Amino acid sequence: MRFADRPTTEVDVFVAAPPERIWPLVSEINTPSQFGTELQKAVWLEVEGLEGPPPCPGARFTGHNFHAARGEWQTTNVIIDCEPNQVFAWAVGDDPSFPAATWRYELTPEGDGTRLRFRAQMGPGPSGMTAVIEQMPDKEERIIARRLDEWAANMTATLTGIKEQAEDGA
């Protein structure tokens, strides 16, 4: 697996609640910071000419992150898809057409509840990880696999937290 292949990871969970109860949790940019270990907080940025309040497409936020191997850093993020009760997605970086990563929640009604998916894709734009790969190109596959595992663990923790909160509100 190479960075040029735009590696992805996806996790999902069944939530015994309707999409309308889950939506406020997935569209709240600080939800992952409540359950995962990397995102510490997120802050909306002002954007002139925005056609509505966040989290509408084009809205931007700063992500404040921490990783034991890297320390602290910030990212600019842009909402790229926002369909209430269905999809919430953002791109990492100033240029959403060339992001460092893309993150996406999808809510699909299923029986008496909702199938909640959380997907993340690396690239195609540069990130802190691409600099590490450039320094150790022979370890690219291992670096990517480890990073995808870290992402999946945080994503799973986030979905578990969302599930518990949404079902507690039942």
Kindly label every feature range from the protein language model.
Residues 12-16, 78, 106:
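Generic structural detector for well-ordered beta-strands
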Residues 15, 65, 120-122:
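Hydrophobic beta-strand positions in extracellular immunoglobulin-like domains
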Residues 16, 82-84, 110:
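Structural motif
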Residues 18-21, 150, 154:
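Short amphipathic alpha-helical segments
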Residues 44-98, 102, 153-170:
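Glycine-rich portal/gate segments that line the openings of hydrophobic small-molecule binding cavities
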Residues 93-153:
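Beta-strand/loop substructures that line and gate deep hydrophobic ligand-binding cavities in soluble
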